[in-house]
C-alpha cells in the first residue's frame, strides 16, 4: 500500500475510535448506594423527577453535566431525550412546583466530587474520567 492509502486508513480508524469513545458514558453513584445495576426505565424516572428512590428504597439524588457531548449521549442513550426536551420537561416541573431540577456541573471532576460526597447521588461521566472515588453502575435495558 502507498503511504497515502495508509494515512487515509489510519485517519479513518482514528475517527471511528473517537466516535466510539464519545458514545460511551459511565453511570456513577455514591459508594453507599446499594444497587449495582439499574434499568434505563428506572434511570429515566429518577432523572426526570418521577422517582426519588432506587429499587432498594434508598434515596436517589440525580446530578447532571450542564452540557456537552457526554451530556447529550447520556440523554439520548439512557433517557431517550434531547437536551431541549430535558430542559423543557424540567422547566415545566419547576414552574408548576412539582420538582427541582437536578444539580448540574460544569465539569466531570466536579460532578464526581459531588457524587462521592453526597449519599444517594447518581450521575454520569465519560469513560476517560477517573472513577475511583465513586461506584460504577451498570445500565440494563
Question: What do the PLM-derived regions correspond to, one by one?
Answer:
Residues 1-5:
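Positively charged n-region of N-terminal signal peptides that target proteins for export
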Residues 16-22:
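Sec/Tat signal peptide C-region and signal peptidase I cleavage site
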Residues 23-141:
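Exported/periplasmic ABC-transporter solute-binding proteins
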